[in-house]
């Protein structure tokens, strides 16, 4: 007589369905969390894009207002028979025009401090008493002047690189700028342009983040007497607003 097989379910058979249900529930919860996180991230990104766009509009209005004020001050001065002299600039753009030969140690040290390591390197510098004295020492080896908004913007858009973990990274995405400067409320390239151009409270951090610009030799070449001072027909030293036309030739 054959022994009837047991109909009592084993321990594995009893708990297998429950474990499968738990696994399925966990997977479902995980999927829901991922969907919710993705939706939250998308909403945050949209909000950030709107903030960046709003800031850009605000900056544009600010730049236009400042330009109108300068024009009006000039007109008023002329109407009164005077000559309008703008406030001394807070920002200069400095370009190294000479190589490493025959540069005295003090001037060489200042060039290193300014991060002008190679010929045709360019940097934004806050113009104050200390940097003014430094630039006077290195005048024979650099040229510098007052960059306008167009120059600042074109430099950053066309030749802008950031320093990320000591690496030279192209500023191709606002996320790169935000990761480095977000704690200073600099989230986009337009924020960066504004901070540099207006010499804002976080100028030092912004300028140090920007890798020294590597420019090309100017279209048409340097002047024949390149190392003479600009006012003597050369290229060295202070050139005020004429730095803008030079930068255009070097982009």
Swiss-Prot record:
Keyword check for Nucleus: yes
A GO CC term attached to the entry: ribonuclease MRP complex
GO molecular function, one term: structural constituent of ribosome
InterPro entries recorded: Ribo_uL30_ferredoxin-like_sf, Ribosomal_uL30, Ribosomal_uL30_CS, Ribosomal_uL30_euk, Ribosomal_uL30_euk_arc, Ribosomal_uL30_ferredoxin-like, Ribosomal_uL30_N_euk
Phosphoserine: residues bearing it: 58, 245
CDD domains: Ribosomal_L7_archeal_euk
Alphabetic keyword roster: Cytoplasm, Nucleus, Phosphoprotein, Ribonucleoprotein, Ribosomal protein
Region named Disordered: 19-40
One Gene Ontology biological process: maturation of LSU-rRNA from tricistronic rRNA transcript (SSU-rRNA, 5.8S rRNA, LSU-rRNA)
Known partners and oligomeric status: Component of the small ribosomal subunit (SSU). Mature yeast ribosomes consist of a small (40S) and a large (60S) subunit. The 40S small subunit contains 1 molecule of ribosomal RNA (18S rRNA) and at least 33 different proteins. The large 60S subunit contains 3 rRNA molecules (25S, 5.8S and 5S rRNA) and at least 46 different proteins.
NCBIfam families per record: uL30_euk
Similarity comment: family membership: Belongs to the universal ribosomal protein uL30 family.
Role summary: Component of the ribosome, a large ribonucleoprotein complex responsible for the synthesis of proteins in the cell. The small ribosomal subunit (SSU) binds messenger RNAs (mRNAs) and translates the encoded message by selecting cognate aminoacyl-transfer RNA (tRNA) molecules. The large subunit (LSU) contains the ribosomal catalytic site termed the peptidyl transferase center (PTC), which catalyzes the formation of peptide bonds, thereby polymerizing the amino acids delivered by tRNAs into a polypeptide chain.
PANTHER family: 60S RIBOSOMAL PROTEIN L7, LARGE RIBOSOMAL SUBUNIT PROTEIN UL30
Name assigned to this protein: Large ribosomal subunit protein uL30C
Upper classification of the organism: Eukaryota, Fungi, Dikarya, Ascomycota, Taphrinomycotina
Gene, per the UniProt record: rpl701
